[in-house]
């Protein structure tokens, strides 16, 4: 079995369904972590511009370094949410990669960050791929699109099967219910509580 890496399932999907990646023009990545996936997107989708959102102050220095490596990456240093008046962001003390706008059920520090709603940020152009890695805040992210969720063609979403890590966080069934206007094209259960979903507009 090949080692797991963040875009492995997406690459498998592209190969299995013979997706013409040259047709992708616009990619939105929410929860960029370090912008390494954004750099991978520039290779997988040679004609796409990637807009990457990350707000974790501990991660932003590395995001800036990686985003600067490609003129096709725009880094937006804001937290995507359906409640932009809430600026509180949680930084777990020990578990790397689990920072969230949702309150964790484990030890954390907190910080205030800039926020944004996607409905206000986006123009009317189509989004070929929406990538979401939001650590429990998936439905908040999707809600922030409002009617502009209709502009999205393909969604890749990492989500907990059962929400046991965050207070008020999303789980897989809630995300699928929110995306009932999309077709679930592929699903990977990476571990008993981590599901990766690829959905397409019906």
Region annotations inferred by a language model:
Residues 1-202:
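Phosphate/nucleotide-binding beta-alpha loop and adjacent structural elements of enzyme active sites
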